[in-house]
Amino acid sequence: MDLTPREKDKLLLFTAALVAERRKARGLKLNHPEAIALISAAILEGARDGRTVAELMNYGRTILTRDEVMDGIPEMIPDVQIEATFPDGTKLVTVHQPII
């Protein structure tokens, strides 16, 4: 299986998101990389489902709450930016203050 560097990055991101999802389901608080991975993967999947950039910017703020991450993590993540593929091309989605 030959993967491009972009495809390898997406695969790594989704693997990290799966780990984060499982830890969250067990009641563990997520750390910085886990929180970023979970939010990013949800944005990518939302784009694949046909949501708009504006919808994803709002949706990105609903994925995690302050209670689901370790202390100080919300302040460490002022925004999350991810390039997502939409039907009309690749666009940068920015989620400001993703953990409230």
Curated annotation (Swiss-Prot):
Concerning SUPFAM superfamilies, the annotation shows: Urease, gamma-subunit
- Location, primary (coarse class): cytoplasm
A GO molecular function annotation here is: urease activity
Keywords (A to Z) from UniProt:
Cytoplasm, Hydrolase
Q: Name one GO cellular component term.
A: cytoplasm
Reactions listed under catalytic activity: urea + 2 H2O + H(+) = hydrogencarbonate + 2 NH4(+)
Name a single GO biological process.
urea catabolic process
Subcellular localization = Cytoplasm
| Oligomeric and partner information | Heterotrimer of UreA (gamma), UreB (beta) and UreC (alpha) subunits. Three heterotrimers associate to form the active enzyme.
Record's protein name: Urease subunit gamma
Q: Which gene encodes it?
A: ureA
